[in-house]
A protein has these predicted regions:
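Active-site metal-binding loops of divalent metal-dependent hydrolases
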Residues: 11, 169, 264
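Conserved beta-alpha-beta core of the PfkB/ribokinase-like small-molecule kinase fold
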Residues: 132, 138-217, 235
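Conserved N-terminal subdomain of the carbohydrate kinase-like
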Residues: 15, 46-137, 309
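Short, conserved phosphate/pyrophosphate- and ester-handling motifs at nucleotide-, phospho-/glycolipid
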Residues: 37, 199, 262
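Glycine-rich phosphate/adenosyl-contacting loop at the front of the ribokinase-like
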Residues: 1-72
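Structural alpha-helical scaffold elements that stabilize or flank donor/cofactor-binding regions
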Residues: 125-126, 188-189, 220
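Conserved phosphate-binding/catalytic region of the ribokinase-like
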Residues: 3, 208-309
Length: 309
């Protein structure tokens, strides 16, 4: 399995409140997915490369972030560095039920300037060499209007060149001026998407839909090759070639932190789909990895806690 995956998005410094104080790390939805993809590939010793595309500063914290990603096996060749910008930061507070509250400092983060400062033709030349392009709703939400148009045009060209486009909407209301703008943007990217890895709660919050069937009906109109609609601890609905199949999870009784549950699911899904071409096996792999991640604190669990898929 010789494949190249490009992951586009934002990574931030992560501060985690623990019983003993504060712990510093890094996280961001797409970076989490990139790390877990790289780990799975390395553990199986397969020829699958994962490159992260974003922007950071030229400060020592940005240096530390890049070194950490490299240690995880993520290619950082195309991470842009801007001397006048810094990475964003977020703080996680965990609740007793395993859910969490986030507090962000990201308005002037370097990643917000990446598309604006880079030439689309240059990015296309680089990215068209990849088999699969992965991005999320947050990748879109942090762009200004002009950059958003540039990014969507870039994805359109990459799709036309034969790249597989994978999208996770990961809707975060606070990042969008209005729900209507998020809807318009998501509809544009879904029209270019091959594999949609979405979350039912996010979709229903954005579209005010009452039932899963309402959401499925809307999404299937995009003609997606694969649609996965995740429902947290219950399982997910997988739709391929118009056929719906529910894939349940195995109950996890020691959940401590749901950070990166969806991101890790996506990584395992993509990895297993690339190796097996079986969407159901891919969803089961997603459940396995996500089920392990939520038993640990933080977005990125310890290497020795990784399951075998």
């Amino acid at each position: 399995m010789k494949k190249k995956i490009a992951v586009l998005g934002e990574c931030m410094l992560e501060i985690q409140k623990t019983q003993s104080g504060l712990r510093q790390g890094f996280g961001g939805d797409t970076l989490n997915t990139a790390v877990y993809l790289a780990r799975l590939a390395r553990a199986a010793n397969v020829d699958l490369s994962v490159s992260y595309f974003t922007a950071l500063g030229k400060d020592h914290l940005s240096d530390d972030m890049i070194k950490s990603w490299q240690q995880e096996g993520v290619d950082t060749t195309y991470v842009a560095r801007y001397a006048d910008k810094l990475p964003g930061l977020y703080l996680i507070e965990n609740r007793e039920d395993g859910e969490r509250d986030f507090h962000y400092w990201r308005q002037d983060a370097a990643a917000r300037y990446w598309i604006a400062r880079e030439e689309n033709d240059h990015l296309y030349t680089i990215l068209s060499d990849y088999d699969l392009i992965y991005l999320s709703g947050i990748t879109l939400a942090i762009q200004d209007n002009a950059s958003l148009i540039k990014l969507l045009n870039l994805i359109k060209k990459l799709k036309e060149s034969g790249c597989v486009v994978v999208f996770d909407s990961n809707y975060r209301e606070r990042l969008w001026p209005t729900p209507a703008q998020a809807q318009e943007c998501y509809e544009q990217i879904l029209a270019l998407t091959d594999i949609a890895l979405l979350t039912l709660d996010d979709e229903q919050k954005l579209y005010q839909e009452k039932t899963q069937n309402d959401t499925l009906t809307r999404l299937q109109a995009f003609g997606l090759a694969q649609l996965v609609l995740k429902s947290g601890s219950d399982g997910c609905m997988v739709v391929t070639k118009g056929k719906e199949q529910w894939v349940p999870t195995t109950a996890i009784h020691d959940v401590v932190d749901t950070t990166a549950a969806g991101d890790s699911f996506n990584a395992a899904y993509i990895y297993k789909w690339l190796s097996s071409q079986d969407a159901i096996q891919a969803a089961l792999a997603g459940h396995t990895l996500a089920g392990q991640v939520i038993r640990h604190y933080g977005a990125i669990i310890a290497q020795d806690a990784m399951p075998t898929l």
